[in-house]
Amino acid sequence: MASALEQFVNSVRQLSAQGQMTQLCELINKSGELLAKNLSHLDTVLGALDVQEHSLGVLAVLFVKFSMPSVPDFETLFSQVQLFISTCNGEHIRYATDTFAGLCHQLTNALVERKQPLRGIGILKQAIDKMQMNTNQLTSIHADLCQLCLLAKCFKPALPYLDVDMMDICKENGAYDAKHFLCYYYYGGMIYTGLKNFERALYFYEQAITTPAMAVSHIMLESYKKYILVSLILLGKVQQLPKYTSQIVGRFIKPLSNAYHELAQVYSTNNPSELRNLVNKHSETFTRDNNMGLVKQCLSSLYKKNIQRLTKTFLTLSLQDMASRVQLSGPQEAEKYVLHMIEDGEIFASINQKDGMVSFHDNPEKYNNPAMLHNIDQEMLKCIELDERLKAMDQEITVNPQFVQKSMGSQEDDSGNKPSSYS
């Protein structure tokens, strides 16, 4: 081993033993060039370091190995990274969260290129758990995990990291990029869409769209298109975006989504044949955007919406009559829709198989059972917790030096502009 590398190993050992993590971070940041020049000796360096005791030193070596233009032996490197992430010291790597996250990004990109996304899911879950200060903290690795789950069509491993509400962002020593925030909510929205949890999907797309921005982001544009479609499926109309949405959405993103606005406009007429014509007209656009599946679900949701409207007019109706009123192909298709809607709790009805008549019923829920009271209690607890969090955040902002300085400055400006009451 070259003397400079020996010195690096000795310094890593010494600083780790002394617990001087800040100085150790400075060392590994300076040593990138040295490690890159001695690529053939890096496995020897890894052998001289203990993953648990010298986590930051091992991290630096693996990061450099992955940064090379071509990885000579990917399988060996993959095994080394897998072992490192599962056994490294979480307290140590939190001093170099930027490098640790960077290693995870490199691993993700390599697996995406090799079309092996499934292999990285378990590793990234461990990485997030090591890096997070708490379960409500968002890291840039969250977006990587969601991307791999989407590509592998294996959604459930991501759910524990999507079902929690994020209250904090890991700064990653200033390396956290807005792209990771947008990707987390965009990919998360796609996962929820795939699982047909449209309510949560809509929330995730909204987070991506309403992210403060000064320029158009392609991720925000794609989120906006899916937001329109999921809105129609879930609510039967496009949900209005909050007032704090950036002006670029109205100025630039909306004009780039004309086909989707036309779709929403035609959807509001409740006419399935017109909607089908519009889908055919813009089929190339919807297919190019990979949204044709969602568009078809919009058409299906319009049929359901029209069936729901019939429940407000009729007590009983034949399947044949329903099919003609809703513009379905025949009584068989009408029966299929009604059965699915009964199963999903979208309507309350029964079908008489003898005469093909559908009888509509009132909602049997009386809202007086223990389960309903438990749900109300849970919702109230969430509201209390949210109120406490808001108070804590308000207090945090109130004592923030930058906020105090700005508010004092604005008060001085106001007092300076007021005419004196004494003459």
UniProtKB/Swiss-Prot annotation:
Which UniProt keywords are present, listed alphabetically? Acetylation, Cytoplasm, Nucleus, Phosphoprotein, Signalosome
Subunit structure of this chain's protein: Component of the CSN complex, composed of COPS1/GPS1, COPS2, COPS3, COPS4, COPS5, COPS6, COPS7 (COPS7A or COPS7B), COPS8 and COPS9 isoform 1. In the complex, it probably interacts directly with COPS1, COPS4, COPS8 and COPS9 isoform 1. Interacts with CK2 and PKD. Interacts with the translation initiation factor EIF3S6 and IKBKG. Interacts with ERCC6.
- Domain PCI: start-end pairs: 197-365
Name of protein: COP9 signalosome complex subunit 3
Similarity comment: family membership:
Belongs to the CSN3 family.
- The source organism is Homo sapiens (Human)
- Single GO BP term: signal transduction
Annotated positions of the N-acetylalanine modification: 2
